[in-house]
């Protein structure tokens, strides 16, 4: 377990409460990664020669749609008056998942597979193609509800919905490995990275909600 030291003036000022979720998440990160490695040991043998499967293509393509929606709603932080801690989280989500979309797209392109080009605007529409709805993705109604909120209300609802979204990504990884796919090394590494990152961020968001660092208003 990681041990982190905080300056005495931060603790005495009472501002330490704001950092509790991040402190706990950082301390748990090493344990999460260790558990992840035990849950899905790396493939044995020359995985590069095993080739990829249709399930791998479905996972890599689906994750592009999944990440695109996460980037979309995380990008609302500034315009929807999110608090500092939520903005920091959103910035990390946008940066990390933008990089992963580039890797996912490159993997598909080099194998001459179709590379999805999702339009975030279409994700707000109820008639969005059901084949593009991955586990945990927000419905058009949920997106519209989040888009209507501002400030602390946005923060609280964003965290709850992003936890749902991240849990869906973990489900996608579990389904990939349960099907016997994910043997090709790049696919395995991507799936493992998604699992570890999203698990850590779920822990972080749950702690942020539990710490009650914002006070949602009650509609009149």
Summary of predicted features, one role per range:
Residues 13-23:
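Bacterial N-terminal signal peptides that target proteins for export
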């Amino acid at each position: 377990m990681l041990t982190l030291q905080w300056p005495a003036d931060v603790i005495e000022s009472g501002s330490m409460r704001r950092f509790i979720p991040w402190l706990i998440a950082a301390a748990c990160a090493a344990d999460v990664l260790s558990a992840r490695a035990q849950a899905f040991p790396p493939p044995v043998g020359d995985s590069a020669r095993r080739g990829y499967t249709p399930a791998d293509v479905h996972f890599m393509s689906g994750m592009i749609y999944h990440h695109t929606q996460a980037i979309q709603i995380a990008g609302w932080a500034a315009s929807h008056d999110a608090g500092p801690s939520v903005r920091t989280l959103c910035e990390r989500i946008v940066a990390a998942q933008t990089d992963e979309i580039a890797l996912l797209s490159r993997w598909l392109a080099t194998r001459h597979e179709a590379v999805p080009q999702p339009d975030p605007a279409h994700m707000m529409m109820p008639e969005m193609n059901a084949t593009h709805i991955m586990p945990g993705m927000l419905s058009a109604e949920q997106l519209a509800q989040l888009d209507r909120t501002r400030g602390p209300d946005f923060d609280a609802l964003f965290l709850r919905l992003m936890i749902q979204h991240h849990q869906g990504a973990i489900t996608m990884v579990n389904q990939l490995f349960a099907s016997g796919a994910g043997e090709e090394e790049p696919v395995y590494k991507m799936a493992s990275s998604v699992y570890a990152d999203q698990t850590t961020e779920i822990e972080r968001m749950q702690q942020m909600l539990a710490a009650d660092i914002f006070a949602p208003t009650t509609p009149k």
